[in-house]
């Protein structure tokens, strides 16, 4: 398991005096990787039942799109005349949107890590610590959500119907079009190693760049950095739905997860500021 290698690396870095400081500061990131990989040992579907149909129909009731053409009707998993957004985009997509979707999704983890490294290397250690521990906290909240409510993503219902099959492999869904377009098997490689396909709620894809944007604003980064992060964030939200990897409901809950995580992380400072201004 990858988590074993992370634990060994962390122990080695902590044992060596010259890298001990680095190990201390990057502890949240190591813990994130260890916890995520360790979820393979006890998957969420061993704790609670997997929901496939209820989330699909909730999405349809809130954001359903009328199906009219034969291609649209064939794409509807429950054979009605109402599509979820993921089904609509499975029929209606274009090369330019597919390319942008892949670029946005590739920013999901690398940009937050790059932002953390920037804060660390430029000695903005106060903000580095706050952002790093907030990142871990948001993930922990999200992981708890996975275990409370195991849920299948849209592509599962679109490809397999509404019966949960535990050994279902990861699926690139709409992101496969990016792999085909570029000739690179990036997303096939990433989703083939997915720790658990029944972990759609909340969408941590929606959370990471939102968290990064929030801390870019809080730490008063230049306006163009904030705008760039915000655009990537919005792009990832759109891609999550466009590619069939998440429902709009998942994305909204991912946003809520981020807000809760930031409020918990910054609660002491927010309370002190409120008392000061009262």
Walk through the language-model features, giving the residues of each.
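N-terminal transmembrane-helix/juxtamembrane module of multi-pass inner/ER membrane proteins
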Residues: 1-2, 19, 23-113
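Hydrophobic core of alpha-helical transmembrane segments in multi-pass integral membrane proteins
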Residues: 2-16
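Membrane-interfacial alpha-helical segments at the cytosolic side of multi-pass membrane proteins
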Residues: 114-121, 206-223, 256-265
């Amino acid at each position: 398991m990858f988590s074993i290698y992370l634990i060994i690396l962390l122990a080695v870095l902590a044992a060596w005096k010259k890298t001990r400081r680095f190990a201390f500061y990057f502890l949240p990131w190591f813990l994130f990787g260890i916890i995520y990989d360790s979820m393979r040992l006890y998957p969420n579907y061993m704790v609670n039942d997997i929901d496939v149909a209820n989330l699909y129909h909730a999405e349809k009731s809130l954001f359903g799109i009328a199906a009219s053409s034969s291609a649209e009707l064939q794409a509807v998993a429950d054979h009605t005349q109402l599509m979820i957004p993921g089904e609509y985009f499975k029929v209606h997509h274009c090369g330019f949107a597919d390319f942008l979707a892949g670029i946005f999704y590739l920013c999901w983890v690398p940009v937050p890590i790059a932002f953390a490294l920037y804060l660390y290397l430029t000695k903005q250690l106060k903000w580095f610590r706050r952002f790093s521990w907030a990142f871990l906290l948001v993930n922990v909240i999200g992981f708890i959500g996975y275990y409370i409510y195991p849920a299948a993503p849209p592509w599962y219902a679109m490809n397999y119907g509404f019966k949960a099959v535990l050994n279902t492999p990861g699926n690139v869904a709409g992101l496969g079009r990016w792999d085909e377009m570029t000739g690179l098997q990036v997303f096939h490689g990433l989703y083939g190693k997915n720790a658990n396909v029944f972990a759609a709620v909340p969408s941590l894809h929606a959370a990471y760049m939102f968290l990064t944007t929030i801390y870019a604003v809080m730490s008063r980064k230049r306006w163009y950095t904030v705008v760039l992060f915000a655009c990537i964030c919005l792009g990832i939200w759109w891609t999550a739905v466009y590619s069939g990897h998440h429902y709009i409901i998942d994305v909204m809950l991912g946003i809520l997860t981020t807000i809760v995580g930031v409020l918990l992380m910054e609660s002491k400072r927010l309370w002190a500021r409120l008392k000061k201004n009262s």
